[in-house]
Structures are given as C-alpha cells and as structure tokens.
Amino acid sequence: MSSQTVLVTGGAGYIGSHTVLQLLLGGFKAVVVDNLDNSSETAIHRVKELAGKFAGNLSFHKLDLRDRDALEKIFSSTKFDSVIHFAGLKAVGESVQKPLLYYDNNLIGTIVLFEVMAAHGCKKLVFSSSATVYGLPKEVPCTEEFPLSAANPYGRTKLIIEEICRDIYRAEQEWKIILLRYFNPVGAHPSGYIGEDPRGIPNNLMPFVQQVAVGRRPALTVFGNDYTTSDGTGVRDYIHVVDLADGHIAALRKLNDPKIGCEVYNLGTGKGTSVLEMVKAFEQASGKKIPLVMAGRRPGDAEVVYASTNKAERELNWKAKYGIDEMCRDQWNWASKNPYGYGGSEDSSN
C-alpha cells in the first residue's frame, strides 16, 4: 500500500503542494507535473525540504497536459497506481472574460490525461472538483445529491469533467474515480513554508485579507453587506488546506475499495462563516486591523453555501479537524514569513 506511486497534476499549486507533502509523509511516491502558469517551482523545493527523509520520493516535470508526447513519456517511464488531477485554470472572473482559454486548458488537458491514463492501464483517479458545481443552491447544507449547475465557465469546466468521469465509468467499469467537491480552501501548512501565492489579483477572500495585512493593499473590498445573514455578508464553508490535503489521502485509500465506481464527496467543515467573521478571526490571529470598503453584491454570488460532510465522514473516514482560528493563524504565519509569496519581493505583486 505505502509504496504506491501517484501522478499529481498541478502539484505545484496551492492545494496540490499541500497534498503532495501529505502524500510523501504518508509513504507514497509522488510525480508532479505542472506547467507553472499559476504556481511556482519554489513550492516543490520547499515541499522536499518539509518532507525530510521522504524527499527522494518526489520528482517534478514541467509540462502542460495538452502536450500528449511529453505526458506519454512520463507514463512510459513510470508505472502509476493512481492519479490526482488538480491542474487547471481557476479564476472565476477571468473565466467569464476568457471562456475559450478555460475550455481549452481545463477540458483538453483533462481529455489528453484520461486518454494517456487509459492507454497505460492506469484507471484510478481522484479529481478535484468544486462546490461551484452546485451553482446558487436553494438550501443548505449542500449534499452530494443536489442538482448541478454552474454560474460561470470555470464552474462549467468542473461540471463537464465530472460528467466525463461518470461517462467513462459507465463505459468501462474497471475505472475507479472519486470526485472531490471542495468548498473554500484557506490557511497554510503550519510551518509557514508553503501556502497560497496567487498571481495577479486574488480570486478568494483570504489572499486579499493577507495582502492588506502585510501592506500590499490599502483595504479589503467586501462585496455585499445586505444579505439576509447574521451580519449581512456572504457565508461560506472555509476549510483548512491541510484538512483538504488529508481528504485526498483518504480518497486515494478509498480507491482500493472493490465497491468503488465513480463516487462524489464534499470536502468542507459543514459550518458556514461570514466574511466579517473571517476578517475578525484574521485580525485576532495577526494583531492587524483590516480596513474595509463596502461594495455592492457581485452578480452570481450565492448568499450562503456550506457543505453536508456526512458522506465523507461515513465513507472516507475523514473529518476536518481545524477551525477558523487555526486557519487564520496558519494563514498569517505564511503571510508574515512570505509577504510577497514565493517571489520574495515586491515585483511579484500585481
């Protein structure tokens, strides 16, 4: 079990790098492929340092999944037990402006990956999907049985890939596929050595908050303070990235269950936290005041979204351990040690 070799696409990214570290510490061998479009090879070097005696079980190849020949070479030289597929563009706003870029990158890259996997007899897959596939849910908590819809091209790429996975399994039952729908990943490894380092303008709340805290931005813009929530701001299910990484290890182990076909699991905490509650927790963790600018709601933003985690707890034997105080503590630890992310200087900030 412990000497399994796993291909991790997008393994230099935020969630990918944290998952690769947990894989190595769990005794797995990891081969990372990443085109470094929205990530840094520094993350891979730091994962190796954190992995200590397991560092030799990690190798990295810079490649784009759409490059079939390069991917073929990797599969020809290594026998993979399974694949964790993170790679993809993930900025909701950018996907609305550049839909073809998202369909090309996310869908074609995935199809090439699946074809090469099939050609080499590797049919175990963990796919990183997203709670965006629930669209604007009419009620909460979101269960895995909720109707699926997507409000933007990014979400649609996730939804289409989920459908491709279900179709592949229906066509060939020897595939074993787990789709993980993440909610809102935040935090960083407790060492403060790896974390989220978005290129350009962040897409998510916490990188914005941390950039205000370290002086890279003057204030945090809060989109919508007239929702029917406790303080008027949107409510989301924030999950610590280390919990999320552990969820992937649990999913990999579940692929060995002979009863698994194509299964879906939510990965969240099952608790909703408002934007203002999250900001307050970060202020307490960092000792910094976060100035706020109130703005109107963004079109397509849901009011309240949080996960039902019962299925993952029951079938994966996985449950999130960390609360928002630990998430903010670790986010600040990373931000204060790496105010400009992996770039290390102001010119990496846009």
Swiss-Prot record:
An annotated GO BP: galactose metabolic process
Residues engaged in binding substrate: 130
Pathway: Carbohydrate metabolism; galactose metabolism
Keyword Zinc: no
Keyword presence, NAD: yes
Enzyme class: isomerase
Domain of life per record: Eukaryota
SUPFAM superfamilies: NAD(P)-binding Rossmann-fold domains (SSF51735)
Active site, UniProt feature: 154
Cofactor: NAD(+)
Binding annotation for NAD(+): 5-36
E.C. number(s) listed in UniProt: 5.1.3.2
InterPro entries given in the database record: NAD(P)-bd_dom (IPR016040), NAD(P)-bd_dom_sf (IPR036291), UDP_G4E (IPR005886)
Cellular component terms per the entry's GO annotation: cytosol
Catalytic activity: UDP-alpha-D-glucose = UDP-alpha-D-galactose
Any one GO molecular-function label of the UniProt entry: UDP-glucose 4-epimerase activity
Keyword annotations from UniProtKB, A to Z: Carbohydrate metabolism, Galactose metabolism, Isomerase, NAD
Family to which the UniProt record says this protein belongs: Belongs to the NAD(P)-dependent epimerase/dehydratase family.
Identification of the protein by name: UDP-glucose 4-epimerase GEPI48
